[in-house]
């Protein structure tokens, strides 16, 4: 995006940099949004607490992605919460500055419309996947989702994010015990290998097939 003159001044004079420790809360459900956030480094989860205290992970944020602005544009309080998966650095820009920029810059307005549209499409697809697929399909879909979101390590097969079994369960809309059991089944079938929290994808096409058929 090309921001010129006063627009650059507004952005550059207003941003702050905040660091978050692993598992530290970035914002809470019910809070009033005030800043656009951009993840500079680290990994962030957007989640919602559900029945019985079990969380559902809604989205995963990777570096250079923007978040925490939908509720502001909708004139709502946050309906989700955000926390750092690992030590993370976030850039915060006041939404008051963003609304000024949007009013002056059509490209920036279209950028946010496009991002909101992409996020809505991803949300719609995951809602269907997590409600209609069986446990094996949901876990396989989550593993592919993590690969697409964060990529692989230098070996070309190990996921570049190490989730706890609880987080993987929350991402897959299942209990932790079901996540552990299904991971073990995938490992026994040589679809993956497991080393602590490290998951190596061995048979990606078979996992994609399991995800597709649900």
Regions found by a protein language model. Give the residues of each.
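Cyclic nucleotide-binding regulatory domains
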Residues: 24-86
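Phosphate-/nucleic-acid-contacting segments
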Residues: 148-214
């Amino acid at each position: 995006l090309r921001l010129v003159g006063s627009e650059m001044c507004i952005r550059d004079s207003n941003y702050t940099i905040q660091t978050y420790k692993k598992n530290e809360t970035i914002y809470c459900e019910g809070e009033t949004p005030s800043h656009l956030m951009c993840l500079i480094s680290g990994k962030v989860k957007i989640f919602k607490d559900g029945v019985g205290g079990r969380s559902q992970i809604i989205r995963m944020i990777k570096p250079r992605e923007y978040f925490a602005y939908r509720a502001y544009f909708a004139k709502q309080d946050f309906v989700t919460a955000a926390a750092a998966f690992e030590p993370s650095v976030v850039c915060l820009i006041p939404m008051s500055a963003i609304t000024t920029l949007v009013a002056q810059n059509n490209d920036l307005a279209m950028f946010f419309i496009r991002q909101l549209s992409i996020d809505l499409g991803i949300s719609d697809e995951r809602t269907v996947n997590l409600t209609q697929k069986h446990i094996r399909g949901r876990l396989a879909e989550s593993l592919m989702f993590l690969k697409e979101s964060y990529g692989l390590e230098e070996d070309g097969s190990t996921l570049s994010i190490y989730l706890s079994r609880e987080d993987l369960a929350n991402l897959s809309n299942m209990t932790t015990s079901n996540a552990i059991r299904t991971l073990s089944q995938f490992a026994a079938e040589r679809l993956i290998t497991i080393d602590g929290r490290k998951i190596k994808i061995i048979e990606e096409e078979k996992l994609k097939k399991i995800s597709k058929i649900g």
